[in-house]
Amino acid sequence: MSLVPQRSAPPPPSSSANRAASSLAFQPASTSNSASPTSSSTSTFANGSSSSTTAYRPQPTINTSVSALQGPRSGLPAQTGLAFSVSSLSNNPPAASPITAPSSALPWSSQNPAASGSTATFPPRPVRSNTAGPDTLHTISSVSASQTVAPVMVQRSHSSIAAHQASPSLNQSSPTLDADGPASLTTQSHFVHPSRDRERSRDGTTTPGSRNTFKSVFGGFVNSMSDVFSAQKKIEISTPYDPVHLTHVGFNSDTGEFTGLPKEWQQLLQESGISRQDQEANPQAVIDIVAFYQDATQSQGGSDVWKKMGAAKGNKAPATPRTDTSSEDGIYRVAPQPVLYEKPRTAPAPPGITHPNRPSEFGSPDLRQPPSNASTSSADTALRPSRSTPAPGAAPPPNAKTTSSSNPPPCKPSPASRAPDAPAAVSAASKNAKGPGSVPRRRETKKSTIKDSEVIAKLQAICTDADPTKLYRSLQKIGQGASGGVFTAYQVGTNVSVAIKQMNLEQQPKKDLIINEILVMKESRHRNIVNFIDSFLFKGDLWVVMEYMEGGSLTDVVTCNIMTEGQIAAVSREVLEGLRHLHQHGVIHRDIKSDNVLLSLQGDIKLTDFGFCAQIGESQAKRTTMVGTPYWMAPEVVTRKEYGPKVDIWSLGIMCIEMVEGEPPYLNENPLRALYLIATNGTPKINNPENLSNTFKDFLTTSLDVDAERRPDALGMLAHPFLKRSESLRTLTPLIKAAREQTRKS
């Protein structure tokens, strides 16, 4: 037996007929010196179902003898179970006297074992004729506190009950107050079957008179389910506590010096070509780009970014040759080992000064070099011809032979006999790097946290389980990287030419980028995106098969030819179409540049190299990670702000300058100073802008807007009037052939 406090609803009013029908009651065992509040007690039996209700109204202090509730009493027949009533209600009431009534008036006596301390006993089951009808409802009379009334008891239908089984539970309700008088006392002895527990309301009280119908059962189920789900509260995550700020870099405007700047950063600024005046003019930009540099050198993917920028050159003159040690290992880009297998690409320089070219990187894959010359190509030490910006509508030279005699050849790759010069240049750069003026050594790249077993499992899930050597024939190597080689091959049965990139997974530092690129390529089917064909995991090597773009990359075209505005517009339109498709599917490319735009001999233009692309969703509409090639980076990326797909629009604008001038802005600057100029100069300036049409200049200004909010998206840029001047893509064919011809001569 348990006492569970519950809140009971106010008793419903009862008619006088109901009160007359139930005139037999008994006095409870509890004694009190004052009026007691309303209370209810319920006893539930496991076997059987019956209920009886005894109601009390506000009344003076009731004092009854405890012996009246114990065993057979004088004046009452033994084991009759007849109730007794209180003869008067006063401060000193007389002892309870029995009420003469037929023995069939009540089926048993209501005793309070808890009050008497004895075990409750019950009479045999009453006959059916002496029980109340099935339609009899609980009735509780409503009277004032000053009236004298006997408790009212109404019987509900009874079923089988164990004669001497104790009640498994006793619920004591909480008191209620009557609006018109003192507290009322209502006690219920409610014997119910366990199934009637469904009739309880949500707050735990019993609703007398409610029927065990489908509605009540369903309501109880809904209430119980709502209680279950409401109990599952959302986990609260606390804010960080006890944070420790170890390094804080500030700027003292009085002294014009930075405070708290580590020595390595101070040396880096001194060697980067950022003057003291620059630091005083834009202290916040300096702090941003130094922090950017630090993040890049310590992050997992930072090594590729800075390798793309080339080795730092200290405080060298702007015309100092840029030694590129690019070794980006995208899926379809070969990471060159030293300088071999790199395409020559030089920056403009004054006449008479020779320097190594800016080598372009292998695309997706680098199919710019014919197979016969792939293993003999080397860095070019020849002079990069000075070029003037073409006037609008000027036709480009179809090949090297038609170039004006007043200008040097547009592109002169070095022959194979000049190959030893490249190692010499690399050796010289290595010696210079050991000097006191070199940039501090970069921290070693941390190993990827992803386990090899996880990579293998993911690759096996997305790769075809077959032997690629039986599906492709005549593999011919056209390039070699740190992690594998690039081959051309023919598909067995169809004789279709394909490009295959082989990668040794053990030598691949960023395996997660491999998986990312394969997934993006498989899901991005578009005429302006390089078509992914298949992938294989064969003998520990990953084979990625894609369509063969025999025209090479756009880098070959811009370094060896002068493009017209119509051709630039055509290339920009095709790139924007590919970007629109990616952005609509929640993908940011993040590395748009001429090296990642491949061409076919018919002039088809397709994007490649999705190793740095990012998937964005509703919960991550902006990103802050630093990836891409810094010379093509938007200011919001350099300054480590949140960015979105519009960073690709900025990179497209830089690529347009690349198509005009042959190289991106700040290419010959120290890498750190280049970042400083991107962050502070805003829209880069173009040489000889008077040679460009107003429409083209507006296109550049719009795409290179420093404010990312004002910068249009890919769809908005496609509506620009400049793209209406696009020429046919077939006009690019002569430029592609000219670049390939120069490559063969090398």
Curated annotation (Swiss-Prot):
Task performed by this protein: MAP4K component of the MAPK pathway required for the mating pheromone response and the regulation of cell polarity and cell cycle. Phosphorylates histone H2B to form H2BS10ph.
Comp. bias regions, Polar residues: 106-121, 128-138, 156-176, 370-380
Biased composition (Basic and acidic residues): 194-203
Domain of life the protein comes from: Eukaryota
Keyword ATP-binding included in the entry's annotation: yes
Originating species: Mycosarcoma maydis
Ligand binding (ATP): I478, G479, Q480, G481, A482, S483, G484, G485, V486, K501
Region annotation (Disordered) ranges: 1-138, 155-212, 301-451
Annotated signal peptide: none
Subcellular location, record wording: Cytoplasm; Nucleus
Compositionally biased region (Low complexity): 15-54, 85-105, 414-430
Family: Belongs to the protein kinase superfamily. STE Ser/Thr protein kinase family. STE20 subfamily.
Domain CRIB: 237-250
Stored Pfam families: PBD, Pkinase
Name used for this protein in its record: Serine/threonine-protein kinase SMU1
